[in-house]
A protein has these predicted regions:
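Bacterial N-terminal signal peptides that target proteins for export
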Residues: 1-12
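Bacterial N-terminal signal peptides
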Residues: 10-20
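Cationic, low-complexity basic patches in intrinsically disordered or flexible, solvent-exposed regions
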Residues: 23
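Mature catalytic domains of secreted/periplasmic carbohydrate-active enzymes
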Residues: 26-444
Length: 444
């Protein structure tokens, strides 16, 4: 397999290096293209996405880190694809669920830390088409269905690889799994990884971008980021680079993402406290406790919890990327389905205050958040039982206040000290009372 890889990798190196060499110097002083800037704005407008962790690890029903957590040998893990045959996978069902949930984009694992490509890769035979009885490319089907239904598709790609011998020197997650104690790091990055990225960016039509993960395994290594980022922006200028490295954004990156956290809060303990005011923001989390399918994980977030998380993300000027881990047969857990459909029903009423908005003029608090769009400020009251809510001063004159749902007028007072709203009582099961403040337009 290694010899076969090196022969194929050499061919890819010629193709990949030719693209990237022209751009490496310029990438350090990255100037996003007009298409890229437009894609960033569209990304911010979408607000809600579906994250999907799905791979051969799903067969064991023990999460996406099972290779590492059980300390399996490479030779043992190599048997796993033989049992992966997702005969119930249906791209239309998956994309339709995302759409019903009010999600505007999907980010799916093209390969996770086990290095197994969930697409038809010619760089290595360690992929779903050549190693499983399924013999098909689900990402191709998903890409086609996303285009049909108007959903943007992003590819998650793990930079960390527990399977490839050239991922060397090994990182913080290393264990003795049977790989040799040597490897070619440059070949791994420039030939293997960039070769697969080239496939993803050329064989699946226009995509939303690449969502990177795993650089935290070797945070001080030279990942050849300038070269890889230049390659991506060369092949698809509008594709967004979204790195989950938990660090301050670097040149060439287009979105700052936070894992299991809202921007800047770092309750998870491994995210950066720095929040970019130049890049779109994203918060990712998972609908239960695991990213990949775990048969023993029934700790599902409620629909109300998901709605609250989406509102708080939007109020922090961030998207929410909510994960599901499908079954190995390709079906989606009914518990995920019912909750996501409920969120979609909620968004059919409240979506105006989420989609296309930016973080509002009032800092988020325990009581709730604000979002804004054009001359509207949406006050999302999430946790406040008193009849009056005092808000700090806002720039401009409030001309009216009304409930988003139902349109009832809301009494308010505005003075130099701020805005006081007289809140209607929350109705049963109402997790978010949204008051729309209409602001006087400049010059009016």
């Amino acid at each position: 397999m290694a010899n076969r890889y090196r022969k194929i990798a050499f061919v890819f190196a010629l193709l990949v290096c030719g693209f990237a060499a022209q751009c490496v110097t310029a990438q350090t002083a990255y100037q996003p293209s007009p298409e890229n800037l437009q894609a960033r704005r569209e990304f911010q407008d979408m607000k809600f996405g579906m994250f999907i962790h799905w791979g051969v690890y799903s067969v064991l029903g023990d999460g996406e880190w099972v290779f590492h957590n059980r300390k399996l040998k490479v030779d043992e893990y190599n048997r796993l694809p033989l049992f992966f045959d997702p005969e119930k996978f249906d791209a239309r069902t998956w994309v339709s669920l995302a759409k019903a949930a009010g999600m505007k984009y999907i980010t799916i694992t093209s390969r996770h830390h086990d290095g197994f490509a969930m697409f038809d890769s010619k760089v290595s035979d360690w992929n779903i088409v050549q190693r499983t009885p399924y013999k098909k490319d689900p990402l191709k089907m998903l890409a086609e269905e996303c285009r049909r239904q108007g959903i943007k598709l992003f590819f998650y790609y793990s930079q960390l690889d527990w399977h490839n011998p050239d991922y060397y020197p090994r990182g913080a997650t290393d264990w003795k799994n049977g790989r040799p104690d040597h490897g070619d790091w440059n070949a791994y990055l420039d030939n293997y990884m960039d070769g697969q990225l080239t496939e993803l960016l050329t064989n699946y039509g226009p995509i939303g971008g690449i969502w990177f993960d795993g650089m935290w395994d070797k945070p001080d290594a030279d990942w050849h980021l300038d070269k890889t980022y230049a390659l991506i922006h060369k092949l698809q200028p509008a594709a967004l680079i979204i790195p989950n490295h938990h660090q301050t954004p670097r040149p060439g990156e287009d979105v700052q993402t936070f894992e299991r956290d809202l921007p800047g809060q770092n309750t998870a303990g491994f995210n950066t406290n720095y929040v970019s005011n130049q890049l779109p923001l994203e918060s990712c989390d998972t609908l239960n406790d695991n990213w990949g399918f775990n048969i023993g994980d029934s700790n599902y977030k409620s629909a109300a919890d998901l709605e609250s998380r989406l509102v708080r993300a939007a109020g922090n000027n961030s998207n929410l990327l909510m994960n599901i881990g499908p079954y190995p047969n390709g079906e989606i857990d009914p518990q995920f389905v019912t909750r996501l459909q409920a969120v979609g029903e909620w968004l059919s009423k409240y979506g105006e205050s989420i989609y296309g908005t930016r973080g509002g003029p009032i800092a988020p608090g325990n009581w709730g958040v604000t979002t804004q769009k054009d001359n509207k400020v949406y006050v999302h009251v999430l946790n406040w039982s008193a009849p009056l809510l005092a808000l700090p001063p806002v720039a401009g004159k409030v001309t009216s206040a009304q409930m988003l749902v139902g349109g009832a007028t809301t009494e308010f007072t505005q003075n130099a000290n701020g805005v006081i709203l007289k809140l209607p009582a929350a109705s049963k099961d109402e997790i978010d009372r949204v008051i729309v403040l209409t602001m006087a337009k400049a010059g009016a």
